[in-house]
A protein has these predicted regions:
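Carbohydrate transferase catalytic cores enriched for Leloir-type hexosyltransferases
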Residues: 1-369
Length: 369
């Protein structure tokens, strides 16, 4: 822990108000909670103008000061005019930490968190407006950031390849909380959602890079016909889930976004967690499933493999046959499933939010020394 007097940090939290906050908001909130629990920081959140606080579970654990512009206008002003300063909302600060994509103007040292560069990997999945916004942000990442915190080695490599100075990049992996739920509570939750049969689970925003067509086609070909597929996550874009699952009838359940406690119970109750994503900056759901003691099947060649280590069955996410074979292996072997459960819990235990916060503090200390 760095030894300072109290340091005031402006910490952007606008993603908590997004229609689909997702993993980036969860990471920002978890780190904020850990940093706030210490005594060395006066951490103050920054957001655009909103009439209401974000909905649970996205309520920040720190006070949030709002600037006088709605989100889109604020981002345009930040990127094109380099104003307004966050200090207009927060007062004087010693450091600014931008936890989302947008880059605020700064007279204090600026830390950025970058989770992924998905739009560079598959720009066709983004609108022209979205690509323009990300290109503006990337230009400012290169020119304005004093340090850039990357959630995986894969993201760090992508940042370097995109022209961010290597000397400014720091690896700061995300964390995961241990999931321990009583069997009775799991059973109650499953019953409430009408999940009466064994099931394969996938969790994540329903968007193209999650590779749902491959997952659904692979599931349709598994050997066991007494197993269902459960999809959990907010609706994203360009994915017609209902059309994909219609041929499988009631063997596929699409539950949408769930409260954290219910989601964790489904992790714990699943036979296997399958996450054949085409691209991830970290792959937090993989570690969440492992923390719940659930066997994992996930993708080679993405940051999910980096997160999973040797504790998952890894597949080519573009191969329906490989995904089907992996599901059959885990569903057909109690010994393999138990081995993956134990290995997964051990792997997840290596990723702690307290460590993420400590590494974040070290980055702050570099700039404030």
């Amino acid at each position: 822990m760095p030894q300072w007097g109290v340091v005031r940090v402006a910490y952007t939290l606008e993603q908590c108000w997004h229609e689909v906050p997702g993993g980036t908001a969860r990471a920002a909130l978890e780190v904020a909670a850990e940093l706030h629990a210490g005594s060395v920081l006066d951490l103050v959140g920054v957001s655009a103008l909103h009439r209401h606080p974000p909905a649970p579970p996205w309520v920040p654990p720190i006070p949030v000061r709002q600037l006088a512009l709605p989100r889109l206008a604020l981002y345009e002003a930040w990127h094109l005019m380099r104003r307004p300063a966050v200090q207009r909302a927060t007062g004087p600060v010693d450091l600014i930490h931008a936890t989302g994509v947008a880059v605020p103007p700064h007279s204090a040292p600026l830390v950025l968190t970058v989770h992924d560069l998905a739009y560079l990997h598959d720009p066709a999945q983004f609108t022209a407006k979205g690509r323009r916004f990300f290109n503006q942000a990337l230009r400012l990442w290169r020119s304005d950031a004093d340090l850039v915190l990357c959630s995986s080695a894969a993201t760090l490599a992508d940042c370097a390849a995109a022209g961010l100075p290597k000397r400014k990049l720091r690896l700061v992996p995300l964390g995961v909380r241990e999931v321990r739920i009583a069997p009775g509570e799991v059973a109650t939750t499953l019953a409430r959602y009408g999940l009466e049969r064994p099931f394969v689970l996938s969790v994540g925003t329903l968007e193209p890079r999650k590779n749902l067509p491959t997952l659904i086609e692979a599931f349709a070909q598994i050997a066991r016909n007494d197993v269902d597929l459960v999809l959990v996550g907010a609706s994203g874009w360009h994915t017609q889930v209902d059309e994909l699952v219609r041929p499988l009838g009631n063997r596929v359940r699409v539950l949408g976004f769930l409260p954290n406690a219910d989601r964790d119970a489904l992790y714990a109750g699943a036979e296997v967690f399958c996450y054949p994503s085409l691209f991830e900056g970290f792959g937090l759901p993989v570690l969440e499933a492992m923390a719940a003691g659930t066997p994992v099947v996930t993708s080679l060649g993405t940051a999910t493999a980096e997160a999973a280590g040797d504790a998952a069955v890894l597949v080519d996410p573009r191969s329906v046959a490989q995904v089907t074979a992996a599901l059959d292996r885990v569903l057909g072997s109690e010994a393999l499933a138990n081995e993956l459960k134990e290995a997964g819990r051990e792997r997840a235990a290596l990723f702690q939010w307290s460590t993420t916060a400590e590494l974040t503090l070290e980055a702050y200390a570099e700039l404030l020394a």
